[in-house]
Amino acid sequence: MTVVLTGDDLALEQLVRVARGGETVEISPDAVARMEMTRAVVERVLERDLMVYGLTTGGGARKRVRVHADEAEEFNRRLILNHRVGQGDLASDEVVRGTLLRLANGFAKGMSGVRPELAELVIRALNEGPLPRVRTLGSTGQSDLPQMADLAHGFLDGFVLAAKEGLALINNNAFSSASAALAVADCARLLDALDVAGALDLEAFAANLSILHPAVAETRPYDGLRATLARLTDLLAGSYLWDNGAARNLQDPLTFRCLPNVHGAARDALAFVMRQVEIELNASQDNPIVVADEERLVSVANFDILPLAAALDFLRIALAPVLTSADERLIKLLQAPLSGLPEGLAVRDGLAEDSLTQFAHASQALTAEARLLAQPVSFELASSTHPEGIEDRTTMAPLAARRLAQMIELGERLVSIELVVAAQAVDLRNRPVLGTGTTRAYGLVRDRVPFTDIGDPVPQDLEPVRELIRSGAFSA
């Protein structure tokens, strides 16, 4: 399947398919015509010999320095080279592919004033490769200047840029937007897996399902809560927990009782952030922009993507209690006084070995690190002395996206432990009748990690379970 770029309707799932699935991309004829029209406006403005930021002047603190027509080619070359200050590891291929896609879609919008030939060059790098090498660190989010300079340097390959095209290539947030989109897609899969693990926890703990009573949705009309209640009810359809007397407690610990509420809040946050991502994937991030019907270029601040950066902060904050609760539930399953099962989920009481007890330390370490990553970053301050006090604020959008991705990786590892612990507890409860969804989840886990019997080592390699999460196996 080919994704056709119009500049207006690129969806999150399309970016994921292109970035990870290798789908090809092309630009719509209407978008090509729009780029030709706005480029003609740029050429006419050039003929008027006006002072226009980034077109006939330098950038940043050098906005007062005139760039003449015969200097444009060299100016573009140096602009890109001088911004290649990125540090750290190389971005993954999927992030680079997503960045190329977002850049091309921004050009297709027509506000950049670049020639269609440049947009086609971006598409060719995406479809045919080789992919540019892009460093991950160095952007404050007021345009991903270092990353976009790396990207442009990697695919231009002798292509001669026209006036404004150098600035259009680097003065945008395509790297942050693509990184955010991929992380948010992963977050959706993680939340699905957390629902499944949470449902299996309820059965492993022999918890009280009064928390799923329909009155909860009626009295607290949050979309995320309602969706979570419906999903947990479906996962637990047919479970022994619906039988009279199945629950061990009148009220369970809060991390069991509040599971729908906590997960629901995260789902509300996710829905909001997904909307922000899709807006940003199709919004102009340029400065200046071409206003065709006025035959002019207008200086703006479209590179300030605080709506996305703050939303990513919001999602991490909402995800932290979900992970903390998962950690607490699995630890309680390991504790005999709370679970009613042998300590550490050993085969029987009185054994000297720890069985799965030490998983509690691993889960606490993962959770502590994840919570630290939830700290908001979009309110960080830039130095007002650089350059000449002009660039005096930031969004830190790339950091916000990177921290979400790191938090999700930790979450995947935590949920892998949670699923294994819950499966062990279910086995020790003599394998009661599980729900339709939890039966499937239990089987998937047990196909990869067997029951831990007397003398068995702790199942340290949980990557097969993590791969289930990443594959979307728990999203069905």
Tell me the role of every PLM-derived stretch:
Residues 1-23, 27-34, 38-46, 68, ...:
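C-terminal auxiliary extensions adjacent to catalytic cores
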Residues 25, 85-86, 109:
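A glycine-/small-polar-enriched, mobile loop at the entrance of the PLP active site in fold-type I
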Residues 39, 72, 76, 96, ...:
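Generic internal hydrophobic packing segments that stabilize the cores of diverse globular domains
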Residues 49-51:
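Conserved SET/PR-domain catalytic core that frames the SAM/AdoMet-binding pocket
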Residues 53-78, 82-105, 133-155, 159-177, ...:
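FAD-binding core of FAD-dependent oxidoreductases
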Residues 110-137:
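FAD-binding glycine-rich core of flavoenzymes that anchor FAD
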